[in-house]
Design a protein with these regions (language model features):
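Boundary at the C-terminal end of the N-terminal hydrophobic targeting segment
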Residues: 16, 20-22
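Mature extracellular/periplasmic domains of secretome proteins
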Residues: 23, 86-90, 111-139, 150-170, ...
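C-terminal subdomain of the subtilisin-like protease fold in secreted/lumenal serine endopeptidases
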Residues: 133-142, 153, 165, 193, ...
Length: 297
């Protein structure tokens, strides 16, 4: 498995899956860089799974308070988790968040490389703990295009197991202008894959999104005929220093769809997917066509 730092196994934790708690609010897992946890009041628990460096407990796995907490940073990789959570919270303010940190930090404050092996380990934890925390969606923005949708062994099985429990794994297609392939893990058949639309135009200036304009698939967005949905990728996102910043990218669209999925969650994965498809409209560019979901900002 190749390593990456971009937008973009641990087989078992030795415990049996607990019984579901129907009275708990929905929780979304955000597999990402970690966050300065003091920024958010809706964090349910925290997890750290690292390939390089160590979690706060000195090991490569940690669960509980402080596990996903990271220092304030302006590094684009290390701000990413904060940005994703801010979008999910904007779409569904009532959601609970479980950040899973998969990116280590060097002594100089830079990110270590990481791979989909870390994503797989994070998914392992979700499978075991889904019922305990009432996890209903998993947001993944990391990845890379690999031949034949290569992923670590057991990843597809984890995603299928979560789908069977009415848990959506929602992943970004990537920003490589690839019109035939998506990031792994977005390319897996049981993943809800999300590409980006750009509206009102393809620049990166912080212009307000226009819901009356025709949504157009962004030129930078990866996608193909199997891409589940496209959504607006133009967002003002929270930064670790508490300020906001205008950003574009399939990660933003993915986080928005994650929040929207939880807002509209039905009794089964398929029913929710079908509902999102029913409220979508066609979108396209000169290379791709797909289903666009309007998500109010």
């Amino acid at each position: 498995m190749g390593y990456f730092i971009a937008l973009l196994g641990l087989a078992s934790f030795g415990i049996s899956a607990p019984q579901a708690h129907a009275d708990l609010p929905q929780a979304v897992v955000v597999i990402d860089s970690g966050v300065p946890t003091a920024l958010f009041t809706n964090i349910l628990t925290e997890v750290c799974v690292l390939e390089y460096s160590a979690c706060p407990n000195g090991k490569q796995f940690m669960e509980g308070t402080g596990a996903a907490n990271t220092p304030v940073s302006t590094n684009a990789t290390l701000t990413h988790g904060t940005e994703m959570i801010s979008i999910i919270n904007a779409v569904n303010p009532n959601i609970k968040i479980i950040p899973i940190r998969i990116i280590g930090i060097t002594d100089k404050g830079n990110p270590y490389i990481y791979s989909n092996d870390a994503v797989k380990k994070a998914l392992d934890w979700v499978v075991v703990n889904q019922a305990k925390f009432n996890i209903t969606a998993v947001n993944v923005s990391q990845g890379k295009v690999f031949d034949n949708c290569k992923v670590p062994s057991g990843t597809a099985e984890d995603v299928a197991a979560l789908k069977a429990k009415n848990v959506a794994v929602i992943a970004a297609t990537g920003n490589d202008q690839n019109r035939t392939s998506m990031f792994s893990i977005a390319c897996l058949p049981d993943v809800v894959s999300v590409g980006a639309t750009d509206n009102p135009w393809s620049g990166v200036q912080g212009y307000t999104y226009d819901p009356k304009a025709t949504p157009t698939i962004a030129r930078y967005s990866n996608g193909n005929a199997s891409t589940s949905f496209y959504a607006n990728a133009r967002w003002f996102v929270l930064q670790p220093n508490g300020k906001t910043k205008f950003m574009v990218g399939t990660s933003n669209a993915t986080a928005a769809v994650t929040g929207f999925w939880t807002l509209n969650r039905k009794q089964s994965w398929k029913a929710t997917y079908d509902y999102l498809a029913s409220v979508s409209i066609p979108t396209s560019n000169q290379w791709l066509t797909g289903k666009y979901i309007y998500i109010q900002q």
